[in-house]
């Protein structure tokens, strides 16, 4: 499935701007990570873009109830499977770098954006791993984010958490304008 088809599918099932921005953020980070794991940039991007496409319509059944829609739309089986693995509640083991990366960056991308949004400049490029770690200790900040999952995702992917935060910041900086953020740090 190409990106245009994936975007159309996302927009058909996801109407809220917030969830579309989340999809764009995860797509950006997945595209950034793909070459490091010998993954296809387009494929990894499509998986990131579609991973929550069914959440708005069926949060309780997500992501398993979206599976037939993805299959009918022509998404390859291993990519559908990767999307299924990003939900802990299903208990599907994550085995491939694609599956592990999706899990690792799903909540992290949103958390990094939340950290950027509370900065006076709203510049995602200024977010440092230390700032993310500090906000992780504040249980009232971005309350729904599972802190343990942030750390576990990086560990399962085989990277240091701070390095994954840096990669996430770099990737999000490239799409900051589409996310309602400032991109680069001032010169």
Q: Where on the chain are the PLM-derived regions?
A:
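Acidic/His-rich, divalent-metal-binding segments that scaffold phosphate/diphosphate chemistry
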Residues: 1-58
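Divalent metal-dependent catalytic cores for phosphoryl transfer on phosphate-bearing substrates
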Residues: 37-142, 151
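Active-site hotspot residues in diverse enzymes, especially metal/ion-binding acidic/histidine motifs
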Residues: 24, 28-33, 42, 160-174, ...
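Conserved active-site and cofactor/substrate-binding residues in soluble primary-metabolism enzymes
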Residues: 1, 5, 21-25, 61, ...
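Predominant activation on well-ordered alpha-helical scaffold segments within soluble catalytic domains
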Residues: 7, 11, 24-27, 31, ...
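Active-site oxyanion-binding pockets that recognize sulfate/phosphate
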Residues: 12-16, 98, 158
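C-terminal binding/interaction regions
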Residues: 124, 130-183
């Amino acid at each position: 499935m190409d990106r245009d088809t994936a975007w159309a599918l996302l927009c058909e099932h996801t109407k809220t701007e917030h969830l579309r921005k989340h999809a764009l953020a995860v797509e950006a980070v997945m595209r950034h990570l793909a070459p490091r794991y010998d993954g296809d940039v387009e494929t990894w991007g499509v998986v990131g873009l579609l991973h929550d496409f069914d959440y708005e319509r069926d949060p309780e059944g997500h992501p398993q109830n979206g599976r037939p829609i993805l299959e009918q739309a022509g998404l390859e089986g291993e990519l559908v499977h990767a999307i299924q693995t990003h939900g802990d509640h299903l208990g599907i083991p994550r085995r491939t770098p694609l599956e592990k990366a999706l899990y690792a960056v799903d909540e992290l991308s949103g958390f990094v954006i939340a950290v950027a949004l509370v900065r006076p400049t709203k510049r995602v490029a200024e977010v440092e791993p230390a700032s993310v770690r500090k906000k992780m200790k504040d249980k009232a900040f971005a309350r729904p984010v599972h802190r343990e999952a942030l750390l576990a995702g990086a560990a399962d992917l085989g990277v240091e958490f701070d390095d994954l935060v840096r990669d996430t910041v770099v990737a999000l900086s490239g799409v900051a304008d589409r996310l309602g953020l400032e991109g680069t740090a001032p010169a």
